[in-house]
Amino acid sequence: MRAAEERKGVVPAARRRDQFPVGMRVLAVDDDPVCLKVLETLLLRCQYHVTTTNQAAIALKMLRENRDMFDLVISDVHMPDMDGFKLLELVGLEMDLPVIMLSVNGETKTVLKGITHGACDYLLKPVRIEELRNIWQHVIRRKFSTRDRANLDFYEECNKPPNADSDHVHGHVTCGSPDQSGRPSKKRKEYCSEEEDEGEVNTQDIDDPSAPKKPRVVWSVELHRKFVAAVNQLGIDKAVPKRILELMNVEKLTRENVASHLQKYRLYLKRLSAVASQQVSIVAALGGRDPFLHMGGFEGLQGYQAFTSSAALSSFTPHGLLNSPRNNPAALGTQGVPASKSIQTMSGSHTLSHSINDANKYHLSLPGNQKGNLGQGLATSLGQTQMQQKWIHEETDDLSTILSGNGLSNGMSGTLQSVTSSPLLPQELAECTQAKIVSQPSIRTSSVSSEHIEGAVGVSSGLLESRVSQQSTIPLSGFSANGLLIHGSFNNTCANKLGGTSSSCAPARSSNDLMVARDTKGGASSFGGAMLLPPDTEQKYLNFGGGNGLKQKFDDRTADSLFDLKFVWSSVPSSQLASNIGAHHAMSQRWNNSSSNSSNIGARMIGQATSSGSTVIPQMKTDFLVSGDMAMPKNASDLSIPKLQSELSSSSCSFDGLLNSIVKVEKDDVTFSDDLGCGDFYSLGACI
């Protein structure tokens, strides 16, 4: 039966060319005998010459024995002895024949796989005769594409340099060299046209079975493997027939056989690359996903940024946050205060420091899914979010010749402090009230004005939750506002003693009532003070920054030192204020309650003298150890107060609470009137 079927394909070449597609030779391969019989019947109705087999290995053997015996191959996908895709690959590589895949599986992935492996068409069972009547176009398309590619390869070989292959030197010289425009010369065109004509004649001679044929080499699997190994060793771009033949070292194999096989191999690779380039568009059109394609980026992780290690808590720099527009004289000018006035932003070395003994219990509250642990090096820089803290920068220079009884003769030399509100976390989490410095209309140097400068000053050191927003109003009367530096530190053993919050504010107002910020959550309390200087104080007594080295320190060894946690705010007349000022030199006081953790909080007290002013004095019980080299004057008018320093530190102050206190800022202004019972008053030296 096989011989009879093979005889059906023996038709003179001239007759086939005249009646094409009648007599087209088709090889049908299917393991199902019923489907194979139906396919054969339909192909015979289309007047094709059909050869059938139920095994892929037999079909491959037939093709290798006589590759010119068939024009088209139709193969099933699923076969027991050999997969249809494997047969497709071997046929396309060795014989360069059009192959049509046939299967009952019409899934997109299966069809795409067949097209990727080089199938020219994919038919679904049961096959219709209308589909089989048009399969001849694949044969014509393959012949024309092969001829065009052969001409292109020949053109590339003509343009190769002489050192690429010694065998091509003669052909390169014969073809001539291209002109300056890159176009081939007339001599090359004529040579190429002659080669095309000779190729057509040779094709007709080969198709004619009566013409003598050259002995052909059957490219077996082992022979093809040697060929592929030689090509891979040389490289597909530098592989030439002569070098491949030398590396293969096979008897009865000529250079022409290797050149022909190399050409088919290149065509096969080009076809695979062309199909692969169209694969993406096909998948996009069908709306599916192909597992053979390259995987794209992971969804949702494009904005991910890994934690980067930097210097430990590098954002906690003493001078890093004095960049707010409110601290810029030019920016102050845009808000109503002329930039030409001597309003200077303060820069100092006093910082808000935190000493942590057990760092593993402090965690950062971060946005989104970002998490940080201070126990892991305290050096986590979280992506693009840079943590910035609020710092209080204080002026450490001498405050001499600042206050003047005649007004602002030298400009407003006293510095106005504005707490920098650089964001610790993104703005959607930080709802901090931003300070504003306004003047209506401006600050004049020689006139007494009643304009007010509103500023928010204060620092919060939250143990559980803290909210501080201190509004202060400074009337610009006959004096220039001057700041008295306070640097305080206290230690306490339990956060509950302070109600979970401690804050330091330094407001100053001209009225008798004082706006004090308190946190209503957790029983938080705030303390601070404002000192008012009488207008009749002479200039010589107002020179701050004396050079004497007297310091008053609270003895750390004193066990009976008491610090009353209830602070009282009251108002006293300006005449009584002079007798309450009791510090002549720079002094510092320290309150300790047997703990090692500290939180230094700096604040500024702005003094302003008016006829009727309010004095804010915290009620504290402290003991001073005063040096004996100088006695304290009795009259406050003989005093000059250079600096008042105190230190404030909290042993139980958690870093998490400090962050929450800066993030969650709410303002609850409470007015304390004069009729509040305040208890005993102390001198200013004993209160600050």
Curated annotation (Swiss-Prot):
According to the UniProt record, which residues make up the DNA-binding region?
Answer: 211-270
User: Where is this chain compositionally biased, Acidic residues type?
Assistant: 193-208
The PTM entry states: Two-component system major event consists of a His-to-Asp phosphorelay between a sensor histidine kinase (HK) and a response regulator (RR). In plants, the His-to-Asp phosphorelay involves an additional intermediate named Histidine-containing phosphotransfer protein (HPt). This multistep phosphorelay consists of a His-Asp-His-Asp sequential transfer of a phosphate group between first a His and an Asp of the HK protein, followed by the transfer to a conserved His of the HPt protein and finally the transfer to an Asp in the receiver domain of the RR protein.
Positions modified as 4-aspartylphosphate? D76
The record's keywords, sorted A to Z, are: Activator, Cytokinin signaling pathway, DNA-binding, Nucleus, Phosphoprotein, Transcription, Transcription regulation, Two-component regulatory system
> At the top level of its lineage, which domain of life is listed?
Eukaryota
Q: Which SUPFAM superfamilies match?
A: CheY-like, Homeodomain-like
Q: What is this protein called?
A: Two-component response regulator ORR23
Species of origin: Oryza sativa subsp. japonica
